[in-house]
Amino acid sequence: MSPAAWAVMALAGGAGAVCRYLVDGRVTAAVARRRSRRAAAGGRSPLGAMPVGTIVVNLTACFALGLLTGWAGRAPAWAPGVLGTGFLGGYSTFSTACVEGARLFMAGRARAGCAHTLLMVGVSWLAACAGLALGALAA
């Protein structure tokens, strides 16, 4: 791979990380507002303290990578490296999701920690399958 291709992939990774930060922040803020309204009305949020922003980021990353992979036969040669490895590699945050699940568990919220971890793996896998199927249809 040429030095220019490496540079473009690195820039795409940085752009993906910025997008992750923005998406996670907006989703987290929206969920916090919803939780606050429910609490003011005397109710509980069905999401509890789940880190929903990270779930949304990983779900969309898995779907997008599945879509890209399914479409790869028709994609330009640069697309898998720049978009898959670069942008989506910077955007997805599976390690953060695992740490968040472990933190919930270690804070005495074992059910929430297990639910978060199982939800992340299961739903992310389903999103990747859906992306692969749609990408294959587009190819």
Regions found by a protein language model. Name each.
Residues 1-139:
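Membrane-interface helix-loop junctions in multi-pass transporters/channels
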